[in-house]
Amino acid sequence: MSLDFKKTLNMPSTKFDMKANLVEKEPLFRKKWLEDDIYQKVLKNNANNERFVVHDGPPYANGDIHVGHALNKILKDIIVRYKSLQGYYSPFVPGWDTHGLPIEHKMLTESKLDRDQITVELLRKKSRNYALKQIEHQKKQFQKLQLFSDFSKIYITLDKSYEAKQLKVFKKLALDGLVYKGLKPIYWSPSSQSALAEAEVEYETVTTNSIYVSFDVTKSTFNKVPVGSKLVVWTTTPWTLIANAAVAISFDITYLTVKYQDSLYVVAKNLFYNDLLEKFQWENYEVVDEFLGKEMPRNSIWYKAPLLDFDAPVIATNYVLEDSGTGLVHSAPLFGEDDFSLTFDNDLKLIMHISDTGHIENSQTKYDSLFYEEANKEIIKDLAEKVVHVYTYSHSYPHDWRTKKPIIYRATPQWFVSIDKVRSKIVSELQNKVKTFPEWSKNRMISMIENRGDWTISRQRTWGVPIIIFYDENEKPVINEEIFDHVIDLVANHGTDIWFSSTVDELLPEKYRNRNWTKENDIMDVWFDSGVSSIAVDIDGGKTTLPFDVYLEGNDQFRGWFNSSVINAVAYAGVSPYINLVSHGFALDGQGKKMSKSRNNVVDPLDVIKKYGADILRLWVANSEYSSDVHISESILVQNSEIYRKIRNTVKFLLGNLNNFKYDKDLKLTSIHHYINEELKSVKKEVLENYDKFRFINVIKVLNRYVIDLSSFYFSVTKDILYIRKENDEERQMVLKNFYEILDFLMLALAPIIPTTADEMYSYFNKENKKESLFLERLEKAGDVSFDEKVLEQFKEFFELRDQVNILIENQIQNKVIKRSNELELVLPETASEFLKSLDLKTLLMVSKISYGKTLQVVKFESEKCKRCWNHFASLNKEYEICDLCFSVLKDTLANA
């Protein structure tokens, strides 16, 4: 009789395709999630549970999203999906930052007009419309990342409700005495014609002409520096010499008076011997005198200002260092913080000779109308007789992060938030209430707060939230709660445009009108806009308030959004806005280089999605050590595609075998199947703990290792049980129970990272009480998972034996004694443990016979091969040439054949 034995096997069967086709499937799943309202259903299901909210730092509403955006949003989405699966109430409200110079500048460029040629109202209208269009553009791009949000609720910093809440924060800070107007040097961008905050400054290496120039002493009552001596200073900004008003020395530095070519020069001793002698190339010099800075009496030395006709003092301070220069510092009070500090106790001249555009004006010199950089050359030329040395100097110099042009320190009247009054409270919140990942970043954040100066919040621009301050008839700022509230109500109803389109009296409460008051024209720093988001964003009708569970942004935000947010939140509400502060690095190319169009190394996330699908991009994010800079390239994406393929192949195998399986939670597992189940729990706990620590790379490592181990052992040794035995065989049911629980866990564990694939897997999963989507299921919490360590420990003995046996088998195959392990007989030492003897080693080690002898060895088994299971036996059923097991399985079939 002829029987096709292959048709009698329980072969895997599933319609789950090995080919992912993510590019085609992802839009379909996105559509399904939206139509089925999955996100809202999850929120509703979890509404009364413990909350865990990731607060979105708003990207700027301008241009296409880049790979840095993708990295950031995917990291957040992994957390939101994970916590939602665990039953937490985790609404995610995406935000956009919409004010500021880039949009304003773009509108001016498109209009082909200067600021003074376009009305404020028109410029703001154009800026608003552009920002709203950009939000819609970016929203569509973000949706392609398969984010767990339906984008029905977003926050935008130009919304009038947001602006009104922002002004409430400003009001409280002003009433609490934290806001003040003052003259002090701040970062000024001539290219933007505006003040900048620290977070708006980036540094580039530049090469400039640096000079050592001497100032002639005109008066002296300090005999160690006689009249006629020359004070040598070093500067990289010759244009500031016009505003020179003092020379600063240190109390604690030792100075020399050195005679060279009939002139006396004053320099710091250590710098003279260690640096200046070589630079100046002086020979035949003579040290005439030596003194400590503190020995110089106050107001004892005066010198002629280098470019203007007045005498200026030498002042001893505690901020001058001996690490570079000459130990004597040229001080222009309106162009440097330390320089400005000299004005507090000294009656110094305050000279402002630089216009908003960076041109010299009202300087009483011939340099008027020159741009400050152009003036440098002329000044060096004109001071030739006083210049001791000139050289080119490469150094890091601040630039405007938007225009990429150099900036300067320049004192102008600005509005500030005082940090000193809230500094200790902020530091306390960071130290005691905030967890950071990576851990070292807490010290970085604390250090920034401890060392930062007051926050310049005013900007001399048009597109932004106004500083709602009025000035009385004496030009003094009016800080009045009633007036603040009145204006804030106007903004809540009409938006901030009303500040610019209305007269002063139209903005004031009636009783304050007709007083000849004026209003402030400056707008707020955009970091103040985004920095109030923890207070201004309405997540769910006011139920969710700060502190939020997670802030997650690039590590450039330590001086940006992380900084402005904690200042505003502590000043307004007395608490940190975040509980967990997570930072990531920048996305670089495969060689670790910054991406740029000029290098032709830009990786566009939308191109990656078009080629590989968003799940591969998301897998790359999860599989990156994001706490540092991350690399992305074609080869790296291919590597992640391989991991994805292994996972998909594993799931296909599981689904195929689980076809028609009915899960029985009460089925007791024994032997290796019990071990596999305990191992699953161990892996589950490890994965969940790494999710909780935001260590997604470890999640991927653990899961990847797990599926490889499953394929190499459990899947291999159970194939005969699955394929050969009767469908309802008890041990076969044990294997399938494990498969079911393994697959159930894998889908849920992978869902935060590769949501489309995970939900696709779920759609093929045979499960009672199945939900519309995997994301309506529940994932356990790490604390609820336990496993029997004794079982895992006990089986170590078996796996040590397996490693030894595999080496012996491999030798037999390489020596061409056998082709497959099931052609061998395994001889175990008679001293083998009772535990090993209790196991079905024939199945677990995939050999044909187990016997016992003096030593561990494998020998070729003289046998016959079963035509159905292909295993080897001493003898077979003569009629059908099959083994006893196969015969028992087919008994009824053969009888009826």
UniProtKB/Swiss-Prot annotation:
Its cofactor is Zn(2+). This is Isoleucine--tRNA ligase. Keywords: Aminoacyl-tRNA synthetase, ATP-binding, Cytoplasm, Ligase, Metal-binding, Nucleotide-binding, Protein biosynthesis, Zinc. The keyword Ligase applies. It holds the Pfam family zf-FPG_IleRS. GO terms for molecular function: aminoacyl-tRNA deacylase activity; ATP binding; isoleucine-tRNA ligase activity; tRNA binding; zinc ion binding. Its EC number is 6.1.1.5.
